[in-house]
């Protein structure tokens, strides 16, 4: 679940112990399996309410808590990001249609720790220009992860994402960002998707963050709807969103969430 980018000067960063990172890994595994459970249902004719109920039931059946549900009054277990919705869309009676795309952003709390991830799915056959947006956004996630190394800075992650996407003609949402994660869904530091190399907090051993590029086909400008949550592109062109929770431990970067379960469900439809 993306945070709001406030560009605060002072941030309180909580570094995790190896034992805490192990607990986060378990939460992230359940988060990953929840996303795959929803993937089984992504198809024309399915409502976003149905996807939300699938996730909620799966999380509860496996001993977790859907952390988005009730967070600041958010009404669902999962953020539903259909087409031009960038982040924080509500589950509803909306029925998926051929050619839609949908980002499913899910946060699971297990044993006091959170895992956070997002994957944008094609619904049936999708326009190739939109598919390329999705591929580029996912690739930019891994460009950011590649530079999430001890001794680097948060700005290195931001710049890697921004450079990769903008060089390919896409725009980067600036008002929303990734974030630290642990016992709380949203912790410091903020992790923007734009910025300069060599700036921002230093990446240290024990850092756990959610990296989540939100990339638009058209303009970077966004609008917050009257519900106070739903964020969409101003020009109503599609937006894509991919996210992993990562940890820095013993000088190595570990991706705690995984798309492998989703890949098993989607087969040759996996992006």
Where are these regions (language model features)?
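Active-site neighborhoods and metal-handling regions in enzymes and metal-associated proteins
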Residues: 2-271
């Amino acid at each position: 679940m993306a945070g709001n980018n406030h560009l605060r000067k002072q941030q309180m960063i909580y570094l995790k112990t190896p034992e805490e990172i192990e607990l986060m890994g378990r939460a992230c595994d359940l988060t990953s399996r929840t996303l795959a459970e929803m993937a089984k249902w992504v198809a024309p004719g399915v409502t976003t309410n149905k996807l939300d109920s699938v996730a909620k039931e799966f999380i509860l059946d496996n001993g977790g808590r859907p952390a988005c549900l009730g967070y600041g009054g958010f009404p669902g277990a999962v953020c539903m990001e259909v087409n031009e919705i960038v982040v924080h869309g509500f589950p509803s009676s909306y029925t998926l249609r051929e050619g839609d795309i949908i980002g499913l952003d899910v946060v699971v709390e297990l044993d006091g720790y959170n895992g956070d991830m997002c994957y944008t799915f094609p619904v049936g056959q999708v326009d190739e220009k939109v598919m390329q947006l999705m591929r580029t956004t996912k690739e930019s996630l891994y460009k950011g992860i590649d530079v999430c190394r001890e001794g680097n800075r948060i700005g290195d992650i931001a710049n890697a994402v921004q450079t990769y996407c903008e060089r390919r003609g896409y725009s980067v949402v600036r008002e929303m960002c990734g974030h630290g994660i642990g016992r709380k869904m949203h912790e410091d530091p903020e992790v923007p998707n734009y910025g300069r190399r060599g700036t921002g907090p230093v990446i240290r051993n024990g850092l756990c963050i959610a990296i989540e590029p939100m990339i638009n086909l058209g303009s970077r400008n966004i609008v917050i709807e009257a519900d106070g949550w739903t964020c969409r592109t101003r020009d109503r062109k599609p937006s894509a969103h991919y996210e992993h929770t990562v940890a820095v431990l013993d000088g190595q970067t570990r991706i705690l969430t995984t798309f492998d379960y989703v890949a098993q469900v989607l087969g040759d439809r996996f992006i």
